[in-house]
Amino acid sequence: MDQQSSDEDADTDFDTQIIIQQSLLDAYKPELTGRTPEDERSQSFSSEDYKKIVEAIETVKYSSYPRPSKEDALASFAKYHPAFDEANGSGWLPLHKAAVQLNKNILEITLNASKPSAWEQTTRNGETPLFLAVSSSLLENAHFLLLNGCDPNAKNFEGNSPLLTAVLKDSYDMATLLINHGANVNLRCANERTALHEAAKLGRQDMVKLMLSSGANPDARSSYGFTPLALAAQGGHTETMQLLLQKGRADVHSQASDSSSVLLEAVRGGDPDSVSLLLEYGADANIPKSSGHLPIHVAADKGHFLALKVLVPVTDIAAIKRSGISPLHCAAAGAHPQCLDLLIRAGFDVNFMLDQRVRKHYDDQRKSALYFAVSNGDLSSVKLLLSAGALPNQDPVNCLQIALRMGNYELINLLLRHGANVNYFCRVNPLHFPSALQYTLKDEVMLRMLLNYGYDTERCFDCPHGERVHRCCTFEGWTSTVIKDTMFCEVITLSWLQHLSGKVVRVMLDYVDQVQICSKLKAVLEKQKLWPEIHVILTNPRSLQHLCRLKIRKCMGRLRLRCPVFMSFLPLPNLLKAYVLYKEYDLYGQGSSTGT
């Protein structure tokens, strides 16, 4: 006896050592094993009887044909009641295993061998045997469990009920079975949704009919305030919506927690038939959500052209004004030129500016629809807006500045032809010269585009120091906290820009009369290859032809210079008109480059 006890103790110590080693491996090498600690404990501590029972159940799991030998083997284990109450690491009892196999006889044997308390016991995911049978769409198994009193309303840990699961599985017969055995059609599941919510969301008309005929509340609200009608509208399930409105008498005016109407949700889905149906039943297109957006804003932003077409006639301009944002802004922001064209043709004001309460959400304080289009680099939308009379100089950050920053030649040219101000000044750290120049120092095409359209070049040569020595300049003017009237000579003579000074100054001289350059700029220019040519221009009188061009341009003014209609009536030969407009220096018009 002592020897036997010693052997048993040694075996126990050995088993304990193995378990400790395995636990350490699991702790330090999680990537090498897919098992959880619970699985390991289950593998280690499950009794032999449990393993034999599960093996007998799973052998017939995938076959509905009777296997008497296996059934008899399982029946022979029925006397081991404790083993039928054991669960593995996932919380699965033999009854859970039996619920998801095809042979009902196996389920019956297992149920009878299990204690009644195990019939409602859940897995680690909160699933009862009935829930698992429903999830596996095993109608006979579910029916058998229901006949034995299993709860049809027991939810899993995610909050889903067997009935809702049947809806998700699109199992009409299963849903009918559950309802006939007491399933609550108005039971609140995950996110406070009912089975009708899910049926409507998925557009399953038969399920919706079944739920409504079984007493489901057509206006039950989810945790976000959505009704089944709203969820059906989101998915564009028009026929399902028709069912809810006709048979369920669902409330077409219901609103979600953020005040989003059913109509707005339908517009978000983009189905025009769903939108039209709701309007037929009295939905109001002028009810905003808490953000202030109307259904028409959502349609324009999403690019739902057909839905937008339906909404335009039924949306009040007064409601749009109260919202503080035009659908034109939304269409431009979403880069939907087709929607933009529809709205413009319908008479929406292209110069409607964002209200202050809307602008504050943008760091650049943008106001116009044109700014949205320019920011997107959307040429089609920009053309539509400018052709309809959009003003390009209404925003705190000039639209031209955005286009210059992008380096988009076509966009820049488009804005300049429609009156973009080349002489704008940035509000922060303004330079002594118009701000647009700083984006063109490395690009002659863009530089000449600005100069051709009347850029104030003379301010670049306006330096109060003249021939005197410049004082030592620090760089505090380049920070965000110090406002400084920085001269052109201070910018172009920076160490990282000096190599550009010769080319930039040479181009500028084509657009000015006789000018004097300061000592600081001259010292840098003298080191450039173009200095001899620049020196000749600076020290000699300009040609009469050139001076006449400058005088004509000054008399005409910048706005007339850009106007093709005005130029066509000017009593001058075409060659002279071209000369006045600097056509010989129009590198973009000559197609020398296309930009980015």
UniProtKB/Swiss-Prot annotation:
ANK repeats mapped onto the chain: 90-119, 125-154, 158-187, 191-220, 224-254, 258-287, 291-320, 323-352, 365-394, 395-424, 426-459
Pathway(s) of this molecule: Protein modification; protein ubiquitination
Highest taxon listed in the record's lineage: Eukaryota
SUPFAM superfamilies (UniProt xref): Ankyrin repeat, SOCS box-like
Keywords assigned: ANK repeat, Repeat
PROSITE patterns named in the record: ANK_REP_REGION, ANK_REPEAT, SOCS
Stretches that traverse the bilayer: none
Domain (SOCS box) ranges: 531-586
UniProt record, GO biological process: intracellular signal transduction; protein ubiquitination
CDD domains for this protein: SOCS_ASB14 (cd03730)
Subunit structure: Interacts with MAPRE2; this interaction promotes MAPRE2 degradation.
Record text about domains: The SOCS box domain mediates the interaction with the Elongin BC complex, an adapter module in different E3 ubiquitin-protein ligase complexes.
Functional summary from the UniProt entry: May be a substrate-recognition component of a SCF-like ECS (Elongin-Cullin-SOCS-box protein) E3 ubiquitin-protein ligase complex which mediates the ubiquitination and subsequent proteasomal degradation of target proteins. Plays a role in the inhibition of cardiomyocyte nuclear proliferation by mediating the ubiquitination and degradation of MAPRE2.
Similarity comment text for this entry: Belongs to the ankyrin SOCS box (ASB) family.
Protein name as catalogued: Ankyrin repeat and SOCS box protein 14
Native organism: Rattus norvegicus
Gene giving rise to this polypeptide: Asb14
